[in-house]
């Protein structure tokens, strides 16, 4: 079941769709993103989607989250030839639609302005933004409030996941030109694959890169998370989806403003 931030002060805020890595789930990703979520909460509502396919837990998951199953993947692992790419795409999009509809039912009504993913979820995030760029069907365009303007790609690799075969067949370029934020851990064993996503599949003029001294995980130290959030707020401002700090607990939260002014 998708996991959402329960704070009702976020109901009116623009929303970011968050996609976990393979071999984890929405609950785990919410925990992994706890520092990013706190820093972004004055400006965005983060909603965590659950992948459709059962999976074994990822190698770095068991040590901390082994009791947090069931574990899921965005694509069948290992690959299952009995499930066509079209059916894989349908299952993915159905999971995302369920997340969107459930959050709408909770009373949230902010526009869906960005997508954030880690590892396999980052690959899907890039694919969703590419679909948005090329006018594909699926979830983009079906819901009036879905208008992804940028993506945050934490340790992501290519190639794109084909979510709309007809749209993919008609595009003239496989390069993602909508804004992307790439977050690379310099100690990550998959670093070269993450750099390939940036260099081969994304337009360097609209892509920004953050490198940090970490391995294959979401930044959780405040000093590392702040750098990521600063870039998110910068791109959000450029794309017109940054909301001024909200009133919480009788006072004004200036977390985002402070980050931008630093």
UniProtKB/Swiss-Prot annotation:
Catalytic center residues: 119, 188, 216
GO molecular function: hydrolase activity
A GO biological process held by the record: secondary metabolite biosynthetic process
Gene3D superfamilies: alpha/beta hydrolase
InterPro entries reported for this sequence: AB_hydrolase_fold (IPR029058), FSH-like_dom (IPR005645), LovG (IPR050593)
Pathway where this protein functions: Secondary metabolite biosynthesis
Induction: Expression is under the control of the azaphilone cluster-specific transcription factor azaR.
Superkingdom of origin organism: Eukaryota
Key words of the record: Hydrolase
EC number, as in UniProt: 3.1.2.-
GO cellular component terms given for this protein: cytoplasm; nucleus
Family: Belongs to the LovG family.
Summary of the function given for this chain in its UniProt record: Probable esterase; part of the gene cluster that mediates the biosynthesis of azaphilones, a class of fungal metabolites characterized by a highly oxygenated pyrano-quinone bicyclic core and exhibiting a broad range of bioactivities. In the first step, the non-reducing polyketide synthase azaA forms the hexaketide precursor from successive condensations of five malonyl-CoA units, presumably with a simple acetyl-CoA starter unit.
Protein name: Probable esterase azaC
Species whose genome carries this gene: Aspergillus niger (strain ATCC 1015 / CBS 113.46 / FGSC A1144 / LSHB Ac4 / NCTC 3858a / NRRL 328 / USDA 3528.7)
Protein's gene: azaC
